[in-house]
Amino acid sequence: MVEWTAAERRHVEAVWSKIDIDVCGPLALQRCLIVYPWTQRYFGEFGDLSTDAAIVGNPKVAAHGVVALTGLRTALDHMDEIKSTYAALSVLHSEKLHVDPDNFRLLCECLTIVVAGKMGKKLSPEMQAAWQKYLCAVVSALGRQYH
């Protein structure tokens, strides 16, 4: 279980309050698929991902970015039970979808870049530290089934 200070909880909540899931979700997934092209292999049914423009203009990528970020947002309401919150999703990604668990980390890195771009100087080092702790807890929970 991850231990959270009151300040860390406030910082994570503050970051989430600045995130528009419908904007940041697609941007984070688009960035992940472009920067780390090997992650595209899990999205073959999404159609054309052959160019950056195709990825950015792909409505299935955008929709899945919203789904992924909505799922990531779930942890905010369950910060004291992140592992159990993501247990079923971990099983799905490991046993059915066979997703490399490192891809969760890559997506979260891309999300952090998107969030930093949106928040600018308002994303203080303390906020970023709490945000990274939150993302690491979720990534660990999603990868738990792989261990």
Swiss-Prot record:
Point out the signal peptide segment.
Answer: none
What are the record's GO terms for cellular component?
Answer: blood microparticle; haptoglobin-hemoglobin complex; hemoglobin complex
Which keywords accompany this UniProt record?
Answer: Heme, Iron, Metal-binding, Oxygen transport, Transport
Annotated protein name in UniProt: Hemoglobin subunit beta-1
Job description of the protein = Involved in oxygen transport from gills to the various peripheral tissues.
Query: Does the keyword field hold Transport?
Result: yes
Question: Record's superkingdom?
Answer: Eukaryota
The record ties this protein, via CDD domains, to: Hb-beta-like (cd08925)
InterPro entries for the chain: Globin, Globin-like_sf, Globin/Proto, Hemoglobin_b, Hemoglobin_oxygen_transport
On subunit structure and binding partners, the annotation says: Hb 1 is a heterotetramer of two alpha-1 and two beta-1 chains.
* Alphabetical GO biological process terms: hydrogen peroxide catabolic process
Q: Does the keyword Cell cycle apply?
A: no
- Which tissues carry this protein? Red blood cells.
Q: Which GO terms describe its molecular function?
A: haptoglobin binding; heme binding; metal ion binding; organic acid binding; oxygen binding; oxygen carrier activity; peroxidase activity
Species for this entry: Gadus morhua (Atlantic cod)
Which Pfam families has this protein been placed in?
Globin
Query: What is the similarity comment for this entry?
Result: Belongs to the globin family.
Q: List residues binding heme b.
A: H64, H93
Domain Globin span(s) in chain numbering: 3-147
